[in-house]
Amino acid sequence: VTTATEYLLVVYVARERRQEPVSTGHVAAVVGRSPSATTEALTRLAERGLVEVEPYEGVRLTDDGETAAVEAYETFTTLSRFFREVLGLPEAGREALGAVDTVDTVVTERIAARLLPDADLPDPAHDPPGVLVDPPE
């Protein structure tokens, strides 16, 4: 199941790597959903004030969407590194994506502070996690 957060993360990373707007086709390919299902999901995010969808143009994050996406990205990257570097999980990115909505930010802040103190968050424009960039195989 693709969550609203996953859509926000994909739009955020794509936006950082390219110019806006981000095509809905790109978002659909990365999340592994049909274009129509992706358009529906993005429309729901627009109704919540998190994105703006322009038909035949693409999608942009609103200020509220940007705030939510940055917070989710920080949680995602912290969990991804924890799952990979501490737990040794081979699918750390996928595991982190599945957990990003369920793990409290206080937990991820403690993980970052105690277990990954020297960890710099990747810059989504230059070092995005593959799970948020590449279509599923």
Predicted segments with their positions:
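Short acidic, hydrophobic short linear motifs in intrinsically disordered regions
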Residues: 18-28
